[in-house]
Design a protein with these regions (language model features):
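N-terminal nucleophile
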Residues: 154, 158-161, 176, 230-246, ...
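Active-site cofactor/substrate anionic-group-binding motifs, chiefly glycine-
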Residues: 45-100
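Acidic, glycine/proline-rich low-complexity segments that act as flexible tails and inter-domain linkers
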Residues: 2-3, 9-29, 34, 42-60, ...
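Catalytic-core signal marking the mid-to-C-terminal active-site face
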Residues: 2-3, 8, 18, 242, ...
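Phosphate/diphosphate-binding glycine-rich loops and adjacent basic-rich segments that engage nucleotide
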Residues: 144-213
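Secondary-shell segments that build the walls of catalytic and ion/ligand-binding clefts
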Residues: 193-251
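A generic, well-ordered mixed alpha/beta core segment in the N-terminal half of proteins
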Residues: 77-166
Length: 333
């Protein structure tokens, strides 16, 4: 089943207005969810929307709260998200980081006490659309064991790196520090599919490709094993230092995944060189990667983010594929 983009956008907007968003903020927030689905990231679009509505019902998200700057020093600012709607606070924080980058060459906003930002790639792409290199990350609740541990005490803290192209076909890595995000596990489970490689442990402590088994144990495998574990810990430390807000351990005491710590960094390469030269560098590296001999005959080797352009085009033309039970849930709200 496919749903037109404008139809999905309108339904998200309708529901958000019902739960206290102003017309302007409802449209901007709905656009983030619809754009994520358009890009093929259903785990942080349609599939995640009902959970956000549940947080609104429970009062975990204040639809009217907006992030405020609490400290500023040159190219750096510290913001308090005031437990508002995560994606809007994150979008505004990255917009400010871009402003600072255009002024100073680099800009950073440390956003504390925010709620889930949905898809982190939204903000990397946002920076790239403004001609900037985007770097951002968020911590999470404790949802992954540190390497060598059984119990979950670290987060699968998503990390995003994006580089701009004048064409808009940016190159971007958007990855949780677990082998798969929980959203991806849900998407594959709903589709009745297994993971392509082991992503976590089952109740017997065995590596498994069954998404439902991993969701049950909450024992995911960090990317790169000990390397992903270490990266998760350091991102949490850096973010908590810069925001003065909540660590993964502290978030774990809140009951729900709220009050998160997020870092937005934008770098303006135009301070060093022209956009044409930046494009030439990116194009040369991308072409070299694409010239790789594929491990499987006929399979394309490409840079991260390039599949998103195709998904956007196809889904805008044909409609966005949806899990029917999730779409029905939204229509009933």
């Amino acid at each position: 089943m496919r749903v037109p983009y404008e139809t999905m956008l309108a339904e998200f907007e309708r529901v958000l207005k019902k739960y206290g968003f102003s017309a302007e903020r409802a449209h901007e927030a709905a656009e983030i969810f619809a754009q994520n689905s358009l890009a093929g990231v259903f785990s942080h679009g349609l599939n995640r929307f009902p959970r956000v509505v549940e947080y609104l019902r429970k009062g975990e998200i204040d639809p009217a709260a907006e992030a405020v700057c609490t400290a500023s020093f040159g190219a750096m600012e510290r913001w308090d998200g005031q437990r508002g709607f995560g994606p809007l606070n994150a979008r505004h924080a990255m917009a400010r980081a871009v402003e600072l980058a255009h002024q100073f060459g680099i800009g950073m906003v440390a956003l504390g006490n925010n709620n889930h930002w949905m898809r982190g790639g939204t903000y990397g792409w946002q920076a790239a659309d403004a001609g900037c290199i985007g770097i951002c990350w968020s911590n999470t609740c404790p949802n992954m064991p540190a390497w060598g541990a059984k119990d979950s005490r670290i987060g699968n803290n998503p990390l995003i790196l994006a580089v701009p192209r004048a064409s808009g076909e940016h190159i971007m890595v958007d990855c949780a520090l677990s082998q798969f995000s929980y959203g991806k596990l849900e998407t594959l489970r709903l589709a009745g599919k297994q993971l392509p490689v082991a992503g976590g442990y089952d109740e017997n402590g065995q590596l498994t490709t069954d998404p439902a088994a991993i969701e049950k144990t909450c024992r995911m495998v960090p990317i790169g094993y000990w390397k992903g574990s270490g990266l998760s810990i350091l991102l949490d430390m850096i973010g908590t230092i810069l925001t003065g807000a909540n660590s993964v351990a502290k978030v774990g005491t809140f009951g729900d995944e709220v009050g998160l710590t997020q870092i937005m960094i934008a770098i303006d390469p135009a301070k060093f060189q022209s956009a044409d030269l930046t494009d030439a560098v990116i194009d040369a590296i991308a072409a070299d990667v694409a010239a790789s001999e594929p491990a499987e005959p006929g399979r394309e080797v490409r840079c991260p983010g390039m599949g998103e352009h195709r998904s956007r085009k196809e889904n805008m033309e044909l409609g966005i594929p949806v899990a029917e039970e999730k779409w029905a849930e939204v229509l009933a709200m």
